[in-house]
Design a protein with these regions (language model features):
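Short linear sequence elements within intrinsically disordered, low-complexity coil regions
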Residues: 35, 45, 49-51, 94-96, ...
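Canonical phosphoinositide-binding patch of PH/PH-like domains
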Residues: 115-145
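Alpha-helical oligomerization segments
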Residues: 149-154
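Anionic N-terminal interaction surfaces
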Residues: 2-66
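Coil-to-alpha-helix initiation sites in intrinsically disordered, low-complexity, charged segments
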Residues: 1-5, 78, 145
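Phosphoinositide-binding peripheral membrane targeting modules
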Residues: 53-115, 130-136, 155
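Intrinsic disorder/low-complexity signal
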Residues: 47, 71, 86, 142-145
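Non-membrane alpha-helical secondary structure
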Residues: 15-22, 71, 136-139, 143
Length: 155
């Protein structure tokens, strides 16, 4: 990685090369777990939860590959290196799922059994606190707003 790549990683959270590699990994992971995976739009999303104990603040980080298409959302929990991969969760009308978007909680998907709140990430500067817990990826503002519009519209 040259100087440009190093600077880009520091300010954007990922070099273009690293981001493209991670997007390809995400697609491969998704397609292995989801039938007709290429028919879904993929986004990397994350969530953070905070607990304030008496002496220490605890932050829990979660990473997700989220695929969406008309009438369905699939969520796959992953780690920041895309090596520890969870099961896929499918949400649609058939299993009484709901999707929502709000400026305060970002994207929500859930049914009677499980739910997720997450934020689609545009970029995360590597110099920000907690960036080492997130997938190194750059997603465009348009990609993020398209996902937000999808979640606002609901199923």
């Amino acid at each position: 990685m040259g100087l440009k790549g190093i600077l880009q990683k520091a300010f954007m959270g990922a070099s273009t090369e690293e981001s493209n590699e991670n997007k390809e990994k995400m697609r491969q992971i998704f397609n292995r777990q989801v039938e007709n995976g290429n028919s879904y739009t993929l986004m990397y999303c994350y969530a953070e939860s905070y607990t304030n104990a008496i002496l220490v603040e605890i932050t829990k980080h979660a990473n997700f590959i989220v695929g969406y298409k008309e009438g369905e959302v699939v969520v796959i929990p992953v780690d920041a290196d895309l090596t520890d991969i969870g099961d896929s969760y499918i949400f649609n009308k058939a299993n009484n799922s709901q999707i929502k978007y709000s400026a305060f909680t970002s994207c929500f998907v859930g049914n009677d059994e499980i739910s997720f709140n997450f934020i689609p990430m545009e970029y995360r500067p590597a110099i920000n606190r907690g960036s080492e817990y997130k997938v190194a990826i750059i997603q465009s503002h348009k990609e993020v707003t398209d996902m937000q519009k999808f979640f606002k519209a609901g199923f």
